[in-house]
Amino acid sequence: MKEEVKKYYGEILKKSVDLQTNACCTRDSYPKYIKDCIKNIHTEVVESYYGCGLVIPDCLEDCNVLDLGCGTGMDVYILSQLVGKNGKVTGIDMTHEQIGKAIKFQKYHNEKFGFENTTFIEGYI
């Protein structure tokens, strides 16, 4: 089963529109401050988002956050903006292709946000 999931997310899915499920919610329901964060994220990361919603508590500034199954990193990059320069966000994903895309755009987001506070790890949760 693990290999099937890796193949689906690593080889079959290329963009958000390729996702074959209705279990995930749309970004239309996100609050404005999250939508504003998404505007700062590279288009290629946003277009390859396969998440099932984002639950974010209040008061994240300066916190350390772990994103399990981070995929291409959109939630990590949203959280990066919310925790700020003194916080840290770590994303873990088992899919080489997904985590590779997250890392590919890490420098872009570091420069865009003005700080480096993200780490990506390829591994199992």
Protein language model features and the residues they cover:
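Conserved alpha-helix/loop element of class I SAM-dependent methyltransferases that forms part
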Residues: 28-64, 78-82
